[in-house]
Each structure stands twice: as structure tokens, then as C-alpha cells.
């Protein structure tokens, strides 16, 4: 994740916390968020080396659906605002829910606690782009793709 993205998400999460307003969702490209050398991001309590397993899982999905787009939904700050945390992947894919579940349940050690189809988009949701800009998810969706969530606890 680059410094522009870090600055944007820090500002957004701190502002939401200060205002007690948690209505917006923020996403990052999985490549930006799961960078194995970036200790600013934590996914399912895996700050550095553990991210490789999630990347391999995602790449397996992308090999089966070349049109898939995978995002990480950020939910908070930890360690005196020095780390952003997440435990949910958002998947745009042409694959069925059964196929997504099969892919994510293949590894025995990191499978998610819950996988389902995301149908409620009533909360404002934004992708934090490469330049720190906010992109509405309405600009990301394609009619031929379903949207799924994969949540780890």
C-alpha cells in the first residue's frame, strides 16, 4: 500500500471514529492490502508472513476466473493507529457460490468461517484507489458478476 492510500484510510478511519459514524465501508485491492512486506496492514491477525497463504488462495480463484476482482474490506485501526485491520475478502466473480466455497475450502488451515453472496449494497462503500482517491463501488460492478464475501473470524 502506498503512502497516498495510507494517508487516505488513516484520515477516513480516524474521522469515522471521532464522529462515531461507521456507515461507510472502505475497500482496497487485495494486492495493495495483502502486500507481505507492508506491516501497516493486518489480515486475520497475520501482519507479514501469514499473508502469503491468503495471496495463494486468491490467485487460485483468479486462475479459475480471469475476470474476478478481489478486494479487502477494512474495519478498523489498532496499535495506536499504526495498523489497519481486516478479515473479509470481497469477490466479484462469474463463478457460482458453490464454486467459490469449494475454492476457499480447499486449504485445510485457512478456510473462512463464512462465505456468502453480498446482496445488500445500501451502505456507502468506496475503494481506496492508487492515488488515495475514493471510487464508489457502483463503478466496479459488472452485470455478469456476482459479489461474494469471505469472512474469517
Regions found by a protein language model. Name each.
Residues 1-108:
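Long, contiguous N-terminal structural blocks used for assembly/anchoring
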Residues 105-117:
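Metal-dependent nucleotidyltransferase catalytic core
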Residues 114-153:
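Acidic, proline/glycine-rich low-complexity IDRs
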Amino acid at each position: 500500500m502506498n503512502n497516498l492510500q495510507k494517508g487516505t484510510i488513516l484520515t477516513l478511519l480516524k474521522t469515522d471514529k471521532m464522529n462515531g459514524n461507521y456507515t461507510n465501508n472502505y475497500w482496497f485491492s487485495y494486492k495493495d492490502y495483502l502486500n507481505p512486506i507492508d506491516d501497516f496492514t493486518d489480515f486475520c491477525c497475520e501482519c507479514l508472513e501469514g499473508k502469503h497463504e491468503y495471496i495463494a488462495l486468491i490467485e487460485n480463484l483468479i486462475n479459475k476466473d480471469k475476470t474476478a476482482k478481489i478486494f479487502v474490506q477494512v474495519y478498523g485501526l489498532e496499535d495506536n493507529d499504526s495498523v489497519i485491520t481486516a478479515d473479509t475478502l470481497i469477490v466479484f466473480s462469474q463463478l457460482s457460490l458453490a464454486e467459490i466455497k469449494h475454492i476457499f475450502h480447499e486449504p485445510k488451515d485457512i478456510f473462512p468461517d463464512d462465505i456468502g453472496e453480498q446482496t445488500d449494497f445500501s451502505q456507502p462503500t468506496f475503494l481506496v484507489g492508487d492515488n488515495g482517491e475514493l471510487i464508489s463501488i457502483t463503478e466496479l460492478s459488472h452485470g455478469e458478476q456476482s459479489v461474494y464475501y469471505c469472512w474469517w473470524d
